[in-house]
């Protein structure tokens, strides 16, 4: 009988020690995660001036282009037609930037001939201007980034932007198909 009582006492003590060790290790692991989390936050604070969007700008509520911009650390994406009118953007006040960038591209195209893109290095950012032809429309994609984009990223970004623009243009063609021609003639 004494052996059973001693066994039970030792068993309970062993379980309590095991649970105590488990909670101690768990507490240490959480402390380690907290330290790592604080280090990451500090490092992100150091990186913020280099990749964070400008706080003085107002962004649109359209999430298609904003999602692309966030996934590639891009500040702004503006798509304009050949007249400089904004088609899609991540900014609310992109009219002036879009018109200026499209005219810059046209001016450089007159000087240099057949060009694929224009890259302007500003004080703290890069401005990329790409020509794009979609459904017979001449468009310009203007990308502002605090980091330089490599060629692979550029192609991926332009491919995703083209996918978003196809949604916009498919909506327009669907609307045109739904409106009878008599209604168009009366306008």
UniProtKB/Swiss-Prot annotation:
- Keyword Transmembrane listed? The answer is yes
List GO terms (cellular component aspect).
membrane
> Where is the protein situated, by its record's location annotation?
Membrane
Q: What is its main location?
A: membrane
UniProt-listed InterPro entries? Roadblock/LAMTOR2_dom (IPR004942)
Q: Which domain of life is it from?
A: Archaea
Q: Which UniProt keywords apply?
A: Membrane, Transmembrane, Transmembrane helix
TM stretches of this protein = 3-23
Q: How is it placed in the membrane, per its record?
A: Single-pass membrane protein
- Name used for this protein in its record: Uncharacterized protein MJ0163
